[in-house]
Every structure is written in C-alpha cells, then in structure tokens.
C-alpha cells in the first residue's frame, strides 16, 4: 500500500524555492501549515510554475504612454540689426588693446583670472560688459570657497556670470548676478530656450552641433550666441593629467598637448582656477 507523509515546512519551502531555468531567484519563503497536510510534489511544482508564469506575464505588460496636450511655444523674434561680437578668453594676458578696440559687447573671463587681475573691470570701455566664467564643475564641498569668490568679484564691479551647468543657476541668482548660459547647458531646441527664459537667463551659447538652418529656426526666447572661432572643448577631466604625468603642477608653464596616432594635437588647459583639465 502507498505510504503518505505529512507535508513539512522544509519540503514545501524547498520545492517552492526551485527557480532554475527562470530569470527569478527565490529570496525567502513564508509558510503556514496546520495539521497533517498531504500534497503531492507534482501539485507543488505546478503551483510554483503557475506563479512564475503569472509573474512573467505581469512583467511583460506595457504601461500605457502618458499623453499630455501639446502646448504651442510662444513666438519670440530674434534681434534685428548686425550681430554683436562677444569674446571669451582663457587668461587675462589675451586681453590686448587690439582686441578691446573691437569693442566686444561682452567679454567672458574666468572667475579666477578676474580675481588675480582686480584692475581688469576698470580697463574696459563702457560698451563692453564683463562676465565672470564659472568652472564647469563645482563640488558641494567647494560651495563656501565659491561663495567667497563671488562676493569678492561682485565687489570689483562684476555683475554677470557665465554658467555651464544648471546647478549653478541658483547659486548665481542667489549671489545677485545676472546669468548667461554657456555651451555646457547643451541647448539644442526651442523648448530649452524658453525654459532658460523662465529661469531668468539673459543669453545662451547654442550647442556646437546645431546647423545654421537650425540656429536660424530655434526660438529666440533669449538672445542667442554661436561660437564662430576658437577651439571646441572635447572633454572635462576631474583629475589633472598634467600633474599625474609630470608629478608637478605645471598648468601655467606652457601648453600641454595630447597627440593621437594621426599626429593631431589636442591642447590641455585647466578649467578656470580649478585643477580640472579641458
């Protein structure tokens, strides 16, 4: 005659935990058995397979897309008249009399360079606005130092900042500066331009990847700038490759270069007053 054994907690948990050949792993099993329960192993296995099949079916369901009404963008016409010249320099030594004679509308200078040359604001004509360029990356641990530098440059008469990431918008506004957007914001479409307008940004350098027709058609919710001459920054590195290579801080000793297998040279410079490399 057949011999029946009562189902034990250990037997039940062992069979339910068998998920081999499936993408699942059983982390734990909770059981509640009362009395002498008898259940064939085949029934337990079938129950486990059914549960896993239901789980797979739930995972395969596609959530319906959330649709929102399309809101047409408000039209903004671009500036009329001749384009205005804005100039960005890496060091104060690049600010020559010949360059100032061009009467740029805005001159962008790294924050650290302005602090190192406090006479710079007084050297510019009334037709040229001076904007301090913030480092593209600032860690939260640098906030106190940055705040002190902003107070110092504000005392020198600087009232505009060029910011390269969205996190700096709040910092700049809180410090009382007008804000201009740098290429790091990667503005590529009209909705982004209108967002910047809502955030109080005064101008925006458009993405390098835009074509001339795209530049023409993008919303002019804020005055737009395009880079027409100069080197394009390829990447930003947290660690100073110059110091790691030479063992000394030599950013100001000359231009360091990377050379690829085709012989192309890529200058490496520091990002503002930081030890990060561009």
Each PLM stretch: what is its role?
Residues 1-278:
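Active-site pocket-lining/capping segments in soluble small-molecule metabolic enzymes
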